[in-house]
């Protein structure tokens, strides 16, 4: 019986190609709603009778999926916001797929709310969820957070609690997720035509492209007598080890390869598949630095992932998927947001710290960090690099300049391994010069 009701915030490729898709395919939902402020996107799906298309990149081609019976609502439109609040009050599952956790409480000139006459009107996602829960008719509600932050659920719960008050833990639970599913929006008409992609809906020059991979982890649901309507997610009592495997494994190596690809002048990640030298660098960083440290840290769990064989399978699968010609991920997308990705505790330097903690030299991760600095300098304007740090050609940097850039990237934060981290990156410069020279001849 389709007794569940689903509401999703944000309608990008993960919401559309994962949460809404799985809700629809499960047959367990009587109503599926997506809240999206892009009116052009809302209109296109609505005009297509609530149906949209997702292109699924497999190892040997692309499949087209059609998802039906989706209600699109724009929370910035007063009438639709009221409908959304009614749906939220009945929702058994809610999923947030926003650009970052910073968007939970955005949405009004007055933080959290705007006022129309005497009636406060909720605008932020946290406010909308809080007001929906206040009027809840559902026996229970779980809220999936998919913002690629290992504390997303706690952050959203705190934001909602400030507006709602104490939540009933017997009826409401906020869940973290580990989503290793790569995806993108293709907006180039030429690429859409050449690759024979199907657009999201007729009249909209955009296409969702997601990979086939579907092993999604979520916090275990603890609400009594409640079974999630989306049944394919794998529940874990403690997600932190798997979140670290994604950040220091998947995300770190993806960024490393993306930065090196950008420094070498590549445009597509699939170009790396035939460059055995670069792929071996990625593989060594994955297995001998990230993987070796994670296995030492989490071997006590006795989970297959944190064994040599399990992590090797995980790494080899990801290296193939990262360079999948049917996903055709762009180097520009993978190497974007370089300032955040080179933060002290982020994917590159966070992995290096983890390796050093377990007595492992992070020489390949350091190469990725140096390549990231090269990307930063090549796109100094785009990344708002201060004028006094725009040193030009990364090949001509001396150690002092590399250190200045790293200190700026870390926002003057430090850690016990700071000097070692900086030295590893400085030492990686010559190796990157040699690698990019070889790339030019490849």
For each of these PLM feature ranges, what is it?
Residues 2-435, 442:
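Substrate/ligand-engaging "lid" and interaction regions
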């Amino acid at each position: 019986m389709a007794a569940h009701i689903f509401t999703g915030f944000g309608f990008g490729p993960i919401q559309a190609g994962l949460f809404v898709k799985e809700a629809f395919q499960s047959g367990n939902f009587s109503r599926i709603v997506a809240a999206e402020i892009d009116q052009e996107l809302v209109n296109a799906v609505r005009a297509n009778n609530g149906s949209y298309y997702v292109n699924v990149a497999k190892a040997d081609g692309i499949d087209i999926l059609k998802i039906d019976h989706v209600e699109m609502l724009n929370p910035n439109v007063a009438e639709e916001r009221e409908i959304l609040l009614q749906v939220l009050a009945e929702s058994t599952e809610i999923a947030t797929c926003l650009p970052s956790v910073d968007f939970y409480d955005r949405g009004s000139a007055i933080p959290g709310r705007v006022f129309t006459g005497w009636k406060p009107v909720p605008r932020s996602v946290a406010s909308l969820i809080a007001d929906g829960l206040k009027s809840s008719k559902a026996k229970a509600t779980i809220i999936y957070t998919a913002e690629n932050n290992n504390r997303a659920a706690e952050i959203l719960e705190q934001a909602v609690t400030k507006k709602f008050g104490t939540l009933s833990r017997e009826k409401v639970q906020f869940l973290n997720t580990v989503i290793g599913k790569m995806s993108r929006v293709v907006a180039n008409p030429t690429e859409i035509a050449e690759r024979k992609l199907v657009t999201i809906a007729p009249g909209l020059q955009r296409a969702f492209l997601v990979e086939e991979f579907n092993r999604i982890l979520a916090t275990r649901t603890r609400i009594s007598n409640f079974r999630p309507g989306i049944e394919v997610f794998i529940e874990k009592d403690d997600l932190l080890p798997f979140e670290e495997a994604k950040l220091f494994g998947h995300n770190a190596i993806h960024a490393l390869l993306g930065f090196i690809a950008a420094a070498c002048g590549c445009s597509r990640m699939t170009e790396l598949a035939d460059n055995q030298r670069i792929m071996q660098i990625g593989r060594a960083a994955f297995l001998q630095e990230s993987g070796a440290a994670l296995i030492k840290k989490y071997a006590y769990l006795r989970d297959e992932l944190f064994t040599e064989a399990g992590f090797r399978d995980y790494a080899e699968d990801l290296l193939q998927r990262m360079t999948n010609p049917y996903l055709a991920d762009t180097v520009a997308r993978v190497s974007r947001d370089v300032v955040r990705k080179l933060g002290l505790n982020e994917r590159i330097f966070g992995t290096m710290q983890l390796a050093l903690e377990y007595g492992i030299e992070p020489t390949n991760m350091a190469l990725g960090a140096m390549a990231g600095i090269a990307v930063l300098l090549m796109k100094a304007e785009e990344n708002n690099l201060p004028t006094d740090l725009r040193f030009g050609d990364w090949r001509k940097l001396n150690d002092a300049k590399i250190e200045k850039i790293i200190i700026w990237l870390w926002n003057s934060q430090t850690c016990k391994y700071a000097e070692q981290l900086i030295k590893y990156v400085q030492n990686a410069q010559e190796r990157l010069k040699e690698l990019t020279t070889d790339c030019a001849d490849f």
